[in-house]
């Protein structure tokens, strides 16, 4: 039993120094969310989508006007998917948010967000984080769980996680300014 315990402990996410952060801002303050956030890797879409994997999605002109200046956003077509580059996440990164708007589709179409990581056995896992309901104007997403919904059992443990955005149904969407909460309130 001790040998099995040692193997399991070795397979747990490694305890590591806190993930490197970025410049903190309060992009959702106008909506009652006073939390500090850092931009996700490539999450502004102003320089394209470096490191993102896009299927049925691409950079377009136009963006939200609440959190940042810029002129671009990421459009995700019907059935399309956008996957962020890996981002280091620990328990101190409890949530994430972004801005979204529906470009076309029905009122029952949704934009879903999920988290992708590799588990202890080397299997890629994708778990739901939340969904955005249709709105023809730019709006902040709901606060979606991140670090507090991952298997981070050891103090200081981290995982490389990808944010996955999928257009469900026949709708198309635009997203902009994806932010991660570093829990430094």
Locations of the language-model features?
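C-terminal region of N-terminal signal peptides and the immediate post-cleavage residues
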Residues: 6-23
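Extracellular glycan-recognition surfaces and repeat-rich motifs
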Residues: 18, 23, 29-32, 38-73
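Extracellular carbohydrate recognition and processing domains
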Residues: 31, 120-158, 166-170
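Solvent-exposed strand-to-loop "edge" motifs in beta-rich extracellular domains
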Residues: 46-50, 86-91, 97-106, 116, ...
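Short beta-strands within extracellular/lumenal beta-sheet-rich domains
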Residues: 70-95
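Short, conserved beta-strand segments of beta-strand-rich sandwich/propeller modules, principally
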Residues: 95, 158-162
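Short, surface-exposed beta-strand/strand-loop-strand elements in extracellular ectodomains
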Residues: 111-118
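Extracellular carbohydrate recognition
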Residues: 166-185
């Amino acid at each position: 039993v001790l040998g099995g315990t040692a193997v399991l402990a070795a397979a747990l996410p490694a305890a590591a120094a806190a993930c490197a952060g970025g410049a903190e801002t309060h992009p959702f303050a106008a909506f009652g969310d006073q939390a500090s956030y850092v931009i996700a890797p490539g999450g502004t879409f102003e320089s394209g989508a470096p490191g993102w994997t896009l299927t049925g999605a691409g950079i377009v002109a136009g963006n939200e006007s609440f959190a940042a200046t810029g002129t671009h956003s990421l459009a995700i077509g019907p059935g399309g998917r956008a996957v962020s580059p890996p981002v280091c996440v620990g328990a101190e990164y409890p949530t994430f948010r972004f801005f979204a708007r529906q470009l076309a589709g029905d009122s029952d179409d949704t934009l879903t967000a999920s988290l992708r990581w590799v588990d202890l056995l080397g299997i890629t896992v994708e778990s739901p984080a939340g969904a955005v309901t249709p709105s023809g104007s730019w709006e902040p997403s709901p606060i979606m769980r991140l670090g507090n919904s991952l298997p981070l059992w050891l103090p200081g443990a981290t995982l490389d996680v990808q944010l996955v955005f999928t257009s469900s149904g026949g709708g198309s969407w635009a997203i902009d300014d994806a932010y991660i909460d570093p829990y430094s309130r």
